[in-house]
C-alpha cells in the first residue's frame, strides 16, 4: 500500500500540469493585503481595500487554486475544490449543508469578492456551483483578523469572474455517471464605450450515486466601466435555484456492544451492521431541500492621486432555504426477548431489532436571510522621513435579518395522521427494512413557529505596513467591532411562512463589542526569500438563547438554568500566532511553509442529540446537548510547493498537519469528552496535482491531468463511537482540441474505486462516498 502511494506521487511528478501561461508567478506580483488573487494570473484584478506591495512584504500565508485547474478536472462543487487547499476540510451534512474547517477551526467565514457571507458564521449552509468563479483563495492565520469578528484560522475568498474588454465565448456540455448532466455558458467582452461585461449560466441535473436527484440552475452578470481616468464602477449580480434530495445516511452504528441471544458478542460499539448496500437510500419520499437566492453588489473606486484611493463596496444578498428531511434513523427496542440481539444494561437486557429502522425524527424548517453590507475604505501611502507607510483605514457595516420557520411539533406515533400537527402522514414513524428500504408513504408538513433574528455589526479598522528597511517590514493593525443580536418569536398562520408582527414576543437582546489587534514582521535576507511572523487576537460574540428540547452546560459541566433570563454563554475570545517562510526561484519553483498556534477560550460546542433517559415504554428520550466546555487549541504546520519544470508542465503539492484539542474540560453527566481530538478535524491532509500539455506535433494541445488527495481519520462525535477512516483518492483526465475551437475531454474520479466516507448524520449515520465515476465533456471556445 505504501509503495502504491509513492508510485502515485511519482506519476504526478512525471505527468504534471498547467501551461506556462497559466502559471502564477509570485516573483514580481503585486498583492493586496486584503486580497489573495495573484494579479499576473489573469487579465483582470479584484481589489479589496488593497495595499500595493509585493507578497514578500506581507506577514501572511496564502493558498490559491484557480477555476481553470478545477474546470479541467470537472469540479464545480466547493466540497471537491477545497481539497486542493492545505489544512482545509469541508464538512457536508444532510446532503448539502456545508461547514468549512481551516486549521482545525470551525465556521470559517467565506467571502464573495471580499465581502463576508454572514450566514457562514452561524450555521452550515448550501453553496451553489462554482462555474462563475475565477479563483478560490485562502488567507490563513492572523491575517484573517482583517475581516472582522469570529475569524480564526483563516478565511476563504471566492473571486468571481470580472468584466473583460476581450471577447469571451465559452460553452460546455457534460455527461457522466448516474445520468449526471451539466451545461455551462460563459460570455464576455465590450458592450459599448467603456462598458465591459461578463455573463455566466449553468445548469446541472443528475440521478446521483445515492439517488438524491440534485438539480442546479445559476446565472451571473458583471458590468464594469472606467468613468474617467480616476474613477471606476463595477456592478455584479447572480441568482441560483438549487434542489437537493437530502441525505440521512445508512443505519446508525452501534452505540454499545450488541450481543446475540446466546450471549456471544455480535457487534462492538461503533461498528456498523455488516453487509449494508451502500447505494440504498433510507430517506422518505417527501424529503427535499430547496435553496433559492440572489445577490447584487456595486463597487466604486476613486483615485485622488497615485498614493491615495477611496473605495466603497455596497452589497445585498437574499437567501431562501426550505427543508424537510428524515434525519434520525432509530432501531426498535423492547424489554422482552422478541428480537435476536440485545444490549447489556447491567441490571437488565434491552433487546434491539437490527433488521429494520424507524424514521423517528423528521425535521421541518426554513431560513430566509436578507443581508445588507457596506465597506468604505481609504488606502494609500505616505512617508515619515525615509520610512514609507502603506495604510488602509475603513468602516464596515452589515445587517442580516433572518426569519426561521419551524415545524417541530410532530404528530405522535399513535395519531400520526392528525393534520393538526406540523408533520403527519403514513411516512412518519414508518419502519423500513435495513436490507431493502422502501418508502412506507408520504409525509405532509407545515410551519407553526417563526423565529425572527436581526444581526448588526459595525467595524472600524486601520492597518499600516511600514517599510522600515529594504530587508525589514512591519505591519500593525487594529479593529473595533460592535455587535448586536436580537431575537423574538411568533406563531405562524395558515401553516405557511407568515406571522403577525403584533403577536411577536419581546426581543431578547445580546450586545458585544471588542478590540482586536494584529502585528507582524517580515525579514527579507535575499530577494527570493522572505521570513515572517505575526500574531492576532480573536473575538466571537455570543448569540445563544434558549431553545426547546435542548440542555445547556456551563464551563463547569453543570446544567444552566435558562429560566434566569440571563444570557446563556460568554463570548469566545482567543489569539493566534504564525511564523512562515516563502521562497521563489525564477518561474521554476515556488515554495512556502508556516507553523501556527491557535487558542480560543469559552468555546461553545454541540454534542449532537443524545439519549438522556427512557420513556415509559423503554424508548430513549433524545435531546440536543450544547455546552461552553472550556478552551480549545490547534497547532501544526503547512507546506506548499509549485514546480514548473517546462513551459508546458507544472506540479503542485501541499501537506498540512493539524493537532486540535479541547482543554480545561470539566466532566458532565451526559457525554465524555476526549481532550485528545476534536471531531471532524483530520491530523494530516495532502494533495498533489499536475498536468502536461503536448506543445507541438500531431497531438499538439493534448493534455493530461492527474490529482491525488489524502484525508486522515476523523472522529464524527465526541464520544468517539464513530470515525471516518483515512483514505486516498486518485482522479485523472485527458483533453484534446478538435477543429474550430472545439475540445473533447474525459475525467475519471476515484480511479481505484476506493470505499470511503466523509460525512455522517448525527455522527453515527454514515454517508458513503462516491465510487469510481466518469464524466465526458464537449466544449467550445472562440479564439
Label for each model-derived stretch:
Residues 37-69:
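N-terminal periplasmic "start-of-domain" segments of outer-membrane beta-barrel proteins
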Residues 90, 99, 115-140, 159-160:
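Short acidic/polar hinge/loop motifs at secondary-structure boundaries
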Residues 119, 131-133, 145-219, 227-232, ...:
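Outer-membrane beta-barrel translocator/receptor signature
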Residues 224-226, 230-303, 318-369, 417-448, ...:
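Acidic/polar loop-and-plug regions of large Gram-negative outer-membrane beta-barrel proteins
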Residues 226-228, 369, 388-392, 396-400, ...:
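Structural signature of Gram-negative outer-membrane beta-barrels, strongest in the C-terminal barrel
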Residues 303, 309-315, 319-325, 532, ...:
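Membrane-embedded beta-barrel scaffold of Gram-negative outer-membrane proteins
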Residues 363, 367, 379, 391, ...:
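Conserved C-terminal beta-signal and adjacent last beta-strands/turns
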Residues 470, 597-599, 617-717, 752:
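Gram-negative outer-membrane beta-barrel transporters
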Amino acid at each position: 500500500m505504501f509503495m502504491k502511494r509513492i508510485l502515485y506521487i511519482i506519476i504526478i511528478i512525471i505527468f504534471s500540469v498547467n501551461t506556462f501561461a497559466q502559471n502564477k508567478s509570485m516573483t514580481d506580483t503585486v498583492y493586496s493585503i486584503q486580497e489573495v488573487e495573484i494579479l499576473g494570473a489573469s487579465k483582470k484584478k479584484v481589489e479589496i481595500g488593497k495595499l500595493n506591495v509585493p507578497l514578500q512584504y506581507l506577514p501572511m500565508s496564502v493558498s490559491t487554486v484557480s477555476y481553470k485547474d478545477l474546470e479541467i478536472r470537472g469540479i464545480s462543487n466547493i466540497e471537491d475544490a477545497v481539497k486542493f487547499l492545505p489544512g482545509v476540510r469541508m464538512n457536508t451534512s444532510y446532503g448539502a449543508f456545508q461547514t468549512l474547517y481551516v486549521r482545525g477551526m470551525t465556521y470559517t467565514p467565506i467571502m464573495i469578492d471580499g465581502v463576508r457571507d454572514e450566514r457562514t458564521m452561524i450555521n452550515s449552509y448550501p453553496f451553489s456551483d462554482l462555474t462563475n468563479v475565477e479563483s478560490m483563495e485562502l488567507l490563513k492565520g492572523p491575517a484573517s483578523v482583517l475581516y472582522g469578528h469570529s475569524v480564526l484560522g483563516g478565511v476563504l475568498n471566492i473571486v468571481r469572474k470580472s468584466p473583460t474588454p476581450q471577447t469571451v465565448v465559452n460553452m460546455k456540455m457534460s455527461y457522466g455517471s448516474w445520468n449526471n448532466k451539466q451545461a455551462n455558458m460563459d460570455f464576455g467582452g465590450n458592450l459599448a464605450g467603456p462598458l465591459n461585461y461578463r455573463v455566466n449560466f449553468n445548469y446541472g441535473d443528475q440521478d446521483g450515486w445515492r439517488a438524491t436527484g440534485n438539480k442546479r440552475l445559476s446565472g451571473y452578470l458583471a458590468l464594469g466601466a472606467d468613468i474617467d481616468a480616476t474613477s471606476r464602477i463595477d456592478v455584479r449580480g447572480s441568482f441560483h435555484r438549487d434542489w437537493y434530495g437530502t441525505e440521512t445516511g445508512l443505519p446508525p452504528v452501534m452505540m454499545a456492544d450488541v450481543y446475540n441471544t446466546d450471549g456471544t458478542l455480535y457487534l462492538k460499539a461503533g461498528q456498523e451492521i455488516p453487509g449494508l448496500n451502500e447505494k440504498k437510500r433510507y430517506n422518505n419520499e417527501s424529503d427535499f431541500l430547496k435553496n433559492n437566492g440572489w445577490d447584487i453588489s456595486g463597487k466604486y473606486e476613486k483615485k485622488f492621486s497615485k498614493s491615495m484611493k477611496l473605495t466603497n463596496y455596497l452589497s445585498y444578498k437574499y437567501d431562501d432555504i426550505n427543508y424537510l428531511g428524515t434525519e434520525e434513523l432509530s432501531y426498535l427496542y423492547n424489554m422482552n426477548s422478541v428480537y435476536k440481539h440485545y444490549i447489556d444494561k447491567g441490571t437488565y437486557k434491552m433487546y434491539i431489532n437490527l433488521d429494520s429502522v424507524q424514521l423517528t425524527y423528521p425535521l421541518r424548517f426554513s431560513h430566509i436571510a436578507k443581508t445588507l453590507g457596506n465597506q468604505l475604505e481609504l488606502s494609500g501611502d505616505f512617508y515619515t522621513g525615509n520610512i514609507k507607510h502603506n495604510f488602509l483605514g475603513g468602516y464596515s457595516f452589515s445587517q442580516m435579518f433572518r426569519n426561521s420557520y419551524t415545524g417541530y411539533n410532530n404528530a405522535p406515533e399513535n395519531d400520526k395522521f392528525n393534520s393538526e400537527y406540523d408533520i403527519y402522514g403514513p411516512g412518519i414513524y414508518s419502519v423500513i427494512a435495513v436490507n431493502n428500504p422502501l418508502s412506507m408513504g408520504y409525509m405532509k408538513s407545515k410551519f407553526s413557529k417563526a423565529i425572527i433574528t436581526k444581526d448588526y455589526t459595525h467595524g472600524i479598522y486601520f492597518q499600516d505596513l511600514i517599510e522600515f528597511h529594504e530587508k525589514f517590514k512591519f505591519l500593525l493593525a487594529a479593529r473595533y467591532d460592535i455587535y448586536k443580536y436580537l431575537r423574538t418569536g411568533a406563531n405562524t398562520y395558515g401553516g405557511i411562512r407568515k406571522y403577525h408582527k403584533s403577536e411577536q414576543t419581546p426581543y431578547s437582546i445580546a450586545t458585544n463589542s471588542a478590540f482586536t489587534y494584529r502585528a507582524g514582521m517580515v525579514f527579507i535576507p535575499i530577494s527570493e526569500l522572505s521570513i515572517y511572523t505575526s500574531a492576532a487576537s480573536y473575538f466571537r460574540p455570543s448569540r445563544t438563547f434558549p431553545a426547546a428540547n435542548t440542555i445547556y452546560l456551563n464551563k463547569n459541566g453543570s446544567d444552566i438554568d435558562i429560566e434566569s433570563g440571563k444570557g446563556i454563554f460568554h463570548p469566545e475570545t482567543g489569539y493566534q500566532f504564525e511564523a512562515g517562510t516563502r521562497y521563489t526561484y525564477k518561474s521554476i519553483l515556488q515554495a512556502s511553509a508556516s507553523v501556527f498556534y491557535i487558542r480560543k477560550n469559552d468555546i461553545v460546542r454541540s454534542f449532537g442529540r443524545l439519549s438522556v433517559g427512557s420513556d415509559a415504554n423503554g424508548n430513549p428520550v433524545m435531546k440536543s446537548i450544547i455546552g461552553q466546555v472550556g478552551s480549545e487549541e490547534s497547532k501544526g504546520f503547512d507546506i506548499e510547493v509549485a514546480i514548473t519544470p517546462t513551459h508546458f508542465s507544472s506540479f503542485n503539492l501541499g501537506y498540512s498537519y493539524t493537532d486540535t484539542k479541547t482543554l480545561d474540560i470539566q466532566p458532565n453527566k451526559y457525554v465524555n469528552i476526549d481532550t485528545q481530538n476534536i471531531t471532524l478535524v483530520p491530523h494530516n491532509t495532502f494533495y498533489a496535482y499536475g498536468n502536461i500539455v503536448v506543445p507541438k506535433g500531431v497531438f499538439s494541445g493534448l493534455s493530461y491531468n492527474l490529482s491525488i488527495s489524502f484525508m486522515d481519520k476523523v472522529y464524527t462525535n465526541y464520544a468517539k463511537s464513530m470515525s471516518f477512516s483515512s483514505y486516498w483518492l486518485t482522479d485523472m483526465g485527458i483533453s484534446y482540441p478538435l477543429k474550430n475551437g472545439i475540445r473533447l475531454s474525459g475525467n475519471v474520479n476515484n480511479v481505484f474505486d476506493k470505499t470511503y466516507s466523509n460525512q455522517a448524520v448525527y455522527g453515527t449515520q454514515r454517508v458513503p462516498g462516491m465510487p469510481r465515476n466518469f464524466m465526458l465533456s464537449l466544449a467550445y471556445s472562440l479564439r
